[in-house]
Amino acid sequence: MFDVTVLGSANLDLVVRTERHPSPGETVLGDDFAEYPGGKGLNQAVAAARAGASTSFVGAIGTDDAGRTLRSVAEIEGIDLSQFVDRDNVPTGRALITVDHRGENSIVVVPGANATVVAPASISALVVLCQL
């Protein structure tokens, strides 16, 4: 039995910082660009594991570079991935995030493999979080 099982999304976040968000049809220059592991589910699983909880994650990724990155992050954090699925021919979820100088963000999510997540028949955990 795990302390925490998270059923949720795993995304590769593509983050650009810019002075201001563009208006429709407008192009603005970005100041910085970075990629981060993300997704509400993966973020919750990482937080639980870092807090010392034995943690499992139920989710889905593609068999692409982004999916391999997210799997590696979860493994490094000590998260059990026995119910984590690699989907062929379906891309890993992505989030395109713009952050302005005030820290306000705008997010577009492409669910990808997250749209294929299926809850297992049973979960053995003290706490279950659903973060899709």
Language-model region placement:
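Short, basic and Ser/Thr-rich N-terminal targeting/leader segments
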Residues: A51, E77, V90-G93
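Ribokinase/PfkB-type carbohydrate-kinase core domain
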Residues: M1-A10, A60, R68, S72-D86, ...
